[in-house]
Amino acid sequence: MLQSIPALPVGDIKKSIGFYCDKLGFTLVHHEDGFAVLMCNEVRIHLWEASDEGWRSRSNDSPVCTGAESFIAGTASCRIEVEGIDELYQHIKPLGILHPNTSLKDQWWDERDFAVIDPDNNLISFFQQIKS
C-alpha cells in the first residue's frame, strides 16, 4: 500500500470547499458535480456531496440507495500528520472551528494533537509525533 486519501461526505460541496481552502489552507485541484479534490502540501482530501433527500420518501426498509443520502454528511473523520502543530493550533484557534472538547495536548501514544470540525461535523484531527 502506498497512501490513504480520506473521502469526506459533505452537505454542500461549495461551502465545504470554501472551509477547507479558507480555514485550513487547502487548494482546490479538481471540482466537478458533487466531487472535489483538495491538496495542502502532500495531503490530499476528497469531498463528495451527500445531499440526496430521496431517502425520506423511500418505502423500502433500507434508506441507503445512492450512497449520497443527506444523513451521511458529517459522519466521517480523518487524521492529518503535521509539523509545527503548536503554530497550526495558534493559527486555527481564533477561527472558531475547534472541536468543543479539544485542546492541544500530548497523548500517551507519543502524539500531540487537536481536532476541528468542518461545517457538516466531520472530525479532522491534526497530530505531530513527539518524543517521550
From Swiss-Prot:
Residue intervals of the VOC domain: 1-129
Please give the PROSITE patterns that the UniProt record associates with this protein. VOC
Q: Which domain of life is it from?
A: Bacteria
UniProt cross-references to InterPro entries, sorted A to Z = Bleomycin-R (IPR000335), Glyas_Bleomycin-R_OHBP_Dase (IPR029068), Glyas_Fos-R_dOase_dom (IPR004360), VOC (IPR037523)
What's a single GO BP term from this record? response to antibiotic
Q: Which Pfam families match?
A: Glyoxalase
**Keywords, comma-separated and alphabetical:** Antibiotic resistance, Plasmid
Ranges annotated as spanning the membrane:
none
Q: Which NCBIfam families match?
A: 156720500_bleO
Q: Main role?
A: Binding protein with a strong affinity to the bleomycin family of antibiotics, which confers resistance to these antibiotics by preventing the bleomycin-induced DNA breakage.
Family to which the UniProt record says this protein belongs: Belongs to the bleomycin resistance protein family.
Q: Report the protein name in the record.
A: Bleomycin resistance protein
- From what organism does this protein derive? Staphylococcus aureus
